């Protein structure tokens, strides 16, 4: 059986935009790198249920989001919604409200777009974050993530201010702040992933290489810290920046990618999700593992390396969480986002 996986990334060197690859799950093999959409710097991508592809996009001196029709093979460009400044770094679809959310790292903004009948987008709200953190990389707000909580609120992670903000989404796409969780100072809050029970979340810190385990109170939309754990071995003292974080759908294992140590940190998750136990690290066979993802059956993990331009394929043991190398050095340039179909 062959599965298709979409890839987004930078177009600074050789990449032309969004690509696809095929995963043969019987042979444990990636093949057929194919260009899907020509777009500048689609560093994060997402699909809605109707087959619309939304990507971060640069456009001349501006940045924003691009929309495409995608039939599984080819794309038709539906248009860009851009403004002055750098492009987004994260995009997510809200199917229930027919909205798309975007995070703008450089401008410190959260943006909301309404999906139109033809799949194109209309900007409905922009919220500017303010503040800073103690590290040089935190001179101002840097919103790095904007996606839904299990109960349908919007949650954002701000790498510049170490804050996780929960919003109610009102009407046709207006945001109203509910709560602000303040992570460890200098953490660099990047992404958050929720346990399948919806009551626990895992916040990854790019700048201090940690994961904070958080309880989530749905009634109040409030986070509280339960545990902090490192993503690195004790004997590693080199540079590192954590990137992606994913939890298996059964809630048993959590993974995070280390850029610098160039590894996936693997954790066993307690039955209620409230505690992580480190069970080791697997080297990713490339440089700067910016993103990774499960295939749709979660038998495999595909790791994308932004700097070494390769994908690595691991077989995943669902009972132990451990990873076995199946393929490395599959060429895919400047990839920063892995999206299984």
Swiss-Prot record:
Belongs to the cycloisomerase 2 family. It comes from Lactococcus lactis subsp. cremoris (strain MG1363). Pfam families: Lactonase. GO terms for molecular function: 6-phosphogluconolactonase activity. GO terms for cellular component: cytosol. This is Uncharacterized protein llmg_2431. Residues 125-146 are annotated as: Disordered.
């Amino acid at each position: 059986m062959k599965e298709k996986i979409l890839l987004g990334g930078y177009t600074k060197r050789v990449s032309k935009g969004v690509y696809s690859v095929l995963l043969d799950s019987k042979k444990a093999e990636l093949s057929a790198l194919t260009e899907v959409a020509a777009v500048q710097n689609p560093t994060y991508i997402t699909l809605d249920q109707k087959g619309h592809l939304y990507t971060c996009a640069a456009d001349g001196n501006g940045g924003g989001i691009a929309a495409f029709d995608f039939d599984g093979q080819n794309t038709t460009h539906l248009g860009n919604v851009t403004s002055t400044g750098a492009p987004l770094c994260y995009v997510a679809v809200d199917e229930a409200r027919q909205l798309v959310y975007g995070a703008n790292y450089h401008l410190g903004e959260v943006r909301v777009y309404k999906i139109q009948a033809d799949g194109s987008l209309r900007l409905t709200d922009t919220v500017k974050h303010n503040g800073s953190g103690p590290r040089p990389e935190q001179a101002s707000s840097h919103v790095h993530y904007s996606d839904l909580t299990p109960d349908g609120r919007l949650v954002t992670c701000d790498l510049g201010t170490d804050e996780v903000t929960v919003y109610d989404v009102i009407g046709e796409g207006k945001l109203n702040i509910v709560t602000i969780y303040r992570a460890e100072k200098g953490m660099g809050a990047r992404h958050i992933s929720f346990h399948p029970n919806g009551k626990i979340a895992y916040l990854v810190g790019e700048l201090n290489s940690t994961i904070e385990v958080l309880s989530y109170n749905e009634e109040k939309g409030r986070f509280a810290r339960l545990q902090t754990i490192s993503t690195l071995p004790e004997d590693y003292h080199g540079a590192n920046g954590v990137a992606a974080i994913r939890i298996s759908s059964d809630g048993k294992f959590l993974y995070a990618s280390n850029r610098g140590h160039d590894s996936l940190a693997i954790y066993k998750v307690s039955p209620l999700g409230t505690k992580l136990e480190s069970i080791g690290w697997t080297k990713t066979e490339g440089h700067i593992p910016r993103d990774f993802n499960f295939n749709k059956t979660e038998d495999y993990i595909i790791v994308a390396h932004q700097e070494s331009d390769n994908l690595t394929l691991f077989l995943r043991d669902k009972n132990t969480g451990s990873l076995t190398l199946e393929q490395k050095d599959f060429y895919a340039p400047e990839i920063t986002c892995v999206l299984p179909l």
